[in-house]
Amino acid sequence: MEFLSEKFALKSPPSKNSDFYMGAGGPLEHVMETLDNESFYSKASAGKCVQAFGPLPRAEHHVRLERTSPCQDSSVNYGITKVEGQPLHTELNRAMDNCNSLRMSPVKGMQEKGELDELGDKCDSNVSSSKKRRHRTTFTSLQLEELEKVFQKTHYPDVYVREQLALRTELTEARVQVWFQNRRAKWRKRERYGQIQQAKSHFAATYDISVLPRTDSYPQIQNNLWAGNASGGSVVTSCMLPRDTSSCMTPYSHSPRTDSSYTGFSNHQNQFSHVPLNNFFTDSLLTGATNGHAFETKPEFERRSSSIAVLRMKAKEHTANISWAM
C-alpha cells in the first residue's frame, strides 16, 4: 500500500472532513467502499474530485482540437498553430510567387518570339555574308581569240593545255575550264538547232512541192477556150484530156444544136449501158455556148471530171475484153 500511496499521492492535502481523508494509520477499506459506491460518479463526487485534485494546468501553446467536419469547413485546423512571421510559411509563399511568375503572358511570349526571329535573321545574314560571291569575268577580244583557237582544235583540253592557255591569256586555270564548259554547252545547243532546221527543210523539199497542184496547163486551156468561143463553136483540145487516153476518145467538135452521140464500139457492146462521154464533156466544160455568155474555167473540176471519165472508160474496155475472150 505504501507503493500505491507513493505513486498516487494527492497533490493537495485533503481536509479532515472529506470522505477521502485517510489518516496515517487509517484503514483502506473505507476508501475502496467509496469507490464502489454509485455516489462516487455523481456530480457531487465530481466536485469533490475537483476539489481534491485541483484544476489541471493548461498549456498556453496548445490549442484544443475541435471536432468539425472537413466538408463543413474548408479551413480545418489539425492542431497546428498558425503563428504570424513563421519562417516555413514565408518560404511557402515565396515558392508560390515564383511559380506564378513563371507563367508567361501572351504579350511577353510574342516579344520573346520577335527577339528570336531577329536573332535568326542576324544568323542568316552572317552566313550569307560569309559565302563567297561569284563575279562574272569579262573577257577581252584577245583572250577570246586565244580561247577560240584552242576550242577549234579540241573541245576537251587537258590540264597542261589549260595551264598554258591561262598563262597566255593571264587568266586562272579554273576560269579557263569554266569557259570551255560553257562553250561546249553553247556548241551542243547550236548543233541541235541546226539539225532540227535541216530536218525541216528536207521534209519541206520532199513532200510540200509534190502536193501543190500543177498550173502550167491552165493558161493554155483558157486561151483555147476563148478562141473557140469567139469562132462560134467550142473544141475540146487534147490538152484537156489525159495523156494515156484511148483511141476511142478522140477530139470531138461540138456544134450548138447537135444531139447527144455515143462513142463507137463493136456490136457486142450494145448489151452494156454506156454513158454519153461527149455530152459529159460538153455539159461540164462548155456551158453557155448558145447563149453567148462568157466562159469561166474551173481547173479543179475539169481535172477531176477527166480522171473519172478515164476510169470509166478503162472499166468498160476491161469488160469488153473479157466478153471477147469468152
From Swiss-Prot:
The entry's DNA-binding region: 132-191
Family stated for the protein in its record: Belongs to the paired homeobox family.
- Motif OAR: where in chain: 306-319
Q: Which residues carry this modification: Phosphoserine?
A: 12, 69, 306
Q: What is its main location?
A: nucleus
Q: Which PANTHER family match?
A: ALX HOMEOBOX PROTEIN 1, HOMEOBOX PROTEIN ARISTALESS
- GO molecular-function annotation terms? DNA-binding transcription activator activity, RNA polymerase II-specific; DNA-binding transcription factor activity, RNA polymerase II-specific; RNA polymerase II transcription regulatory region sequence-specific DNA binding; sequence-specific double-stranded DNA binding
Q: Which InterPro entries match?
A: HD, Homeobox_CS, Homeodomain-like_sf, OAR_dom, Paired_Homeobox_TFs
In the record, biological process GO terms are: anterior/posterior pattern specification; embryonic limb morphogenesis; embryonic skeletal system morphogenesis; mesenchymal cell development; negative regulation of DNA-templated transcription; negative regulation of transcription by RNA polymerase II; neural tube closure; positive regulation of DNA-templated transcription
Related illness:
Frontonasal dysplasia 3: The term frontonasal dysplasia describes an array of abnormalities affecting the eyes, forehead and nose and linked to midfacial dysraphia. The clinical picture is highly variable. Major findings include true ocular hypertelorism; broadening of the nasal root; median facial cleft affecting the nose and/or upper lip and palate; unilateral or bilateral clefting of the alae nasi; lack of formation of the nasal tip; anterior cranium bifidum occultum; a V-shaped or widow's peak frontal hairline.
Instruction: Give the CDD domains listed for this entry.
Output: homeodomain
> What does the UniProt entry say about where the protein is found?
Nucleus
Tissues in which the protein is found: Cartilage and cervix tissue.
What's the protein called, per UniProt? ALX homeobox protein 1
Its domain description in UniProt is: The OAR motif may negatively regulate DNA-binding and therefore transcriptional activity. It is found in the C-terminal transactivation domain that stimulates transcription.
Q: What does this protein do?
A: Sequence-specific DNA-binding transcription factor that binds palindromic sequences within promoters and may activate or repress the transcription of a subset of genes. Most probably regulates the expression of genes involved in the development of mesenchyme-derived craniofacial structures. Early on in development, it plays a role in forebrain mesenchyme survival. May also induce epithelial to mesenchymal transition (EMT) through the expression of SNAI1.
